[in-house]
Amino acid sequence: SGRSRVVQAGDLVLIDDCYNANPVSTKAALDLLSLADGRKVAVLGDMFELGEKEREMHGQVGAYAAEQGIDCLYCAGSLSEEMYRAAKEAGISQAEHFADTDALLAALPELLHPGDSVLIKASHGMGYAKIVEALEK
């Protein structure tokens, strides 16, 4: 479904919210992640259809993740590069940006640790549902 579903996947807690994303819903999802146990990992992707301020809005989300005490930010997509940059500047040392969803998916097994709480959120067109499916296996 991908609408704020919390599931236990092995030794990870997943917050599957990959159906859609805009700045307001993504900040709300980061609020939820900030309350979780363990290391707080945000796996975010591009938010589409935001208009001419889209890069700025992605940057605001990255900075907000840092404000909320998120430990790690991993993101993919061209717009999310701004999110990554802002998160690094705002103090998230464990942040990485990937060119696309497949590159991110390939790297995740090395990046995630047992006990992590992991938010997965992006616009539907980013295909993040396959990340959730892979982690649930």
Go through each PLM region and give its residues.
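ATP-dependent carboxylate-amine ligase
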Residues: S1-K137
